[in-house]
């Protein structure tokens, strides 16, 4: 029987299967192989005498450390439009981490009622131009909620963003609605509102939402200097057009990315952020 781990605590794992939620323990072999089951893992289980055992952990597409979740495919990057104003460097850090982890990012701009249509259009154009979808929401009033739910289908989605952006309001809105719709499931696994630090998955519209915010650590200096450029999707059309193979678009001559910046084809603020991050990596790691 196959399923997905939606919660793990105290050595017990709760697996959602076609036959319902089954409480399981892991085989001892995983400890010997230094492989620990994670929330989000797709697993094969066996039920013996009414007790479930995890027999196999399927290959993971991704692993996040904070929160500890496997196979995340999508991130809602939540920022307030105002109060506080958008910090573009911070937004770029979140987007860089999403790209590094091969997670599809959707930028969700909260408190949309605090800005004009012109301001919204400018922000949308700016973010669309670097390759990301933008959704305008009002977490307190539930505006934009349906558009978010549409994007949850067939994904494991994590919310991320700075403090005060509205992540908790948005998350609790999802949790409250799912409590009303799936009360029996909630009772089965003992879900409460942030009563534990252990992550779990909320089943929403044929997808899952991680109940704890993602990317609580925003350090990007662990990224290899030669890999950073691949975290900027707007560079993709130019990475192979530079004179030198392996060009990092830094101090190398005849660089197609730098030419695209000069021609206005790549946003200069994004390129400046890339250079700042690259220099952080070089200075931190001395390479």
From Swiss-Prot:
Keyword Acetylation attributed: no
Keyword Lipoprotein appears in the UniProt entry: no
Binding positions for GTP per the UniProt entry: 110-113, 161-169
Any one Gene Ontology cellular component term annotated for this protein: cytoplasm
One annotated GO biological process: ribosomal small subunit biogenesis
Binding, Zn(2+): 242, 247, 249, 255
Domain (CP-type G): residue spans on this chain: 61-218
Subunit and partners: Monomer. Associates with 30S ribosomal subunit, binds 16S rRNA.
Family: Belongs to the TRAFAC class YlqF/YawG GTPase family. RsgA subfamily.
Identification of the protein by name: Small ribosomal subunit biogenesis GTPase RsgA
Species name: Clostridium perfringens (strain ATCC 13124 / DSM 756 / JCM 1290 / NCIMB 6125 / NCTC 8237 / Type A)
């Amino acid at each position: 029987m196959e399923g997905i781990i939606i919660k793990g605590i105290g050595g017990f794992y709760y697996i959602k299967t076609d036959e319902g939620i089954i409480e399981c323990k892991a085989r001892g072999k995983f400890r010997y192989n230094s492989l620990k089951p994670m929330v989000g893992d797709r697993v094969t289980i066996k039920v013996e005498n009414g007790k479930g055992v995890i027999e196999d952990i399927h290959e993971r597409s991704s692993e996040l450390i904070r929160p500890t979740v496997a196979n995340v495919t999508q991130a809602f990057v939540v920022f307030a439009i105002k109060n506080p104003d958008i910090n573009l460097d911070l937004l770029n850090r979140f987007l860089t981490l999403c790209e590094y982890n091969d997670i599809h990012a959707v930028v969700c701009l909260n408190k949309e009622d605090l800005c004009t249509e012109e301001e919204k259009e400018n922000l949308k154009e700016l973010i669309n131009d670097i390759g990301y979808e933008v959704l305008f929401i009002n977490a307190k009033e539930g505006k934009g909620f349906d558009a978010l739910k549409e994007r949850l289908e067939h994904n494991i989605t994590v919310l991320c963003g700075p403090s005060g952006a509205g992540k908790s309001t948005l998350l609790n809105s999802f949790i409250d609605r799912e409590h009303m719709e799936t009360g029996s499931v909630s009772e089965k696994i003992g879900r409460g509102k942030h009563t534990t630090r252990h992550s779990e998955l909320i089943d929403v519209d044929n997808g899952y939402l991680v109940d704890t915010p993602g990317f609580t650590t925003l350090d990007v200096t662990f990224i290899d200097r030669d890999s950073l450029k691949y975290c900027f999707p707007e560079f993709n059309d130019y990475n192979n057009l530079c004179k030198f193979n392996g060009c990092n678009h830094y101090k190398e001559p005849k660089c197609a990315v730098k030419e695209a910046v000069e021609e206005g084809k790549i946003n200069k603020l994004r390129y400046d952020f890339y250079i700042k991050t690259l220099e952080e990596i070089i200075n931190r790691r001395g390479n």
